[in-house]
């Protein structure tokens, strides 16, 4: 605060959130580029599964972030906020019965039916997914933030080559 009612700030802890992946496991499954769309993520997960590799894991603390992130691809970030708060978005209410909301949910159900999620994803308590599945190379993708490398450093396989993507 500089005395003229102007508040100044310095970014303290910038971070990103998305998909960390194991480059070695992607190469083993024949994936040559990182996914940039849901369809490409679907195709990559199919290749991983076919290669006997668990495609995706997460922890309880971050799984809902993945859902919100994906839902925003259908209704926008402001639409997700409106859905959660009950506010209007673009002059209309957004409900759980909205066709786009249903489509996002169905795409998650499709991934589950295809076996793309770790069998432990629903019960992983932070930091199990990142430290017991992703870091040692037992799952190819983990949904997490930029704090992951530091948090998982004691569990990381010696040959882990990190990568990061969003779609």
Report each predicted region and the residues it spans.
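Short, solvent-exposed loop/beta-turn-alpha elements that line the ligand-binding surface or hinge
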Residues: 1, 76-103, 154-157
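Hinge/lid segment of periplasmic solute-binding proteins
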Residues: 1-17, 42, 100
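Extracytoplasmic/periplasmic substrate-recognition and gating elements
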Residues: 29, 114, 154-167
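Beta->alpha turn/N-cap motifs
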Residues: 144-149, 167
């Amino acid at each position: 605060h500089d005395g003229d009612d102007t508040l100044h700030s310095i970014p303290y802890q910038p971070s990103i959130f998305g998909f960390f992946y194991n480059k070695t496991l992607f190469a083993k499954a024949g994936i040559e580029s990182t996914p940039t769309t849901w369809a490409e993520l679907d195709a990559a997960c199919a290749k991983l599964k076919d290669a006997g590799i668990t495609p995706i894991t997460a922890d309880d603390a971050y799984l809902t972030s993945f859902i919100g992130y994906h839902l925003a691809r259908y209704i926008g970030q402001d639409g997700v906020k409106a859905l959660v708060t009950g506010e209007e978005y673009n002059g209309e209410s957004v409900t759980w019965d909205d066709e786009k909301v249903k489509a996002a949910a169905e795409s998650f159900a499709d991934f589950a039916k295809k076996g793309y999620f770790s069998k432990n994803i629903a019960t992983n308590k932070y930091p199990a997914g990142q430290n017991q599945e992703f870091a040692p190379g037992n799952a190819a993708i983990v949904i997490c933030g930029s704090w992951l490398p530091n948090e998982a450093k004691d569990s990381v396989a010696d040959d882990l080559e990190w990568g990061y993507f969003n779609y």
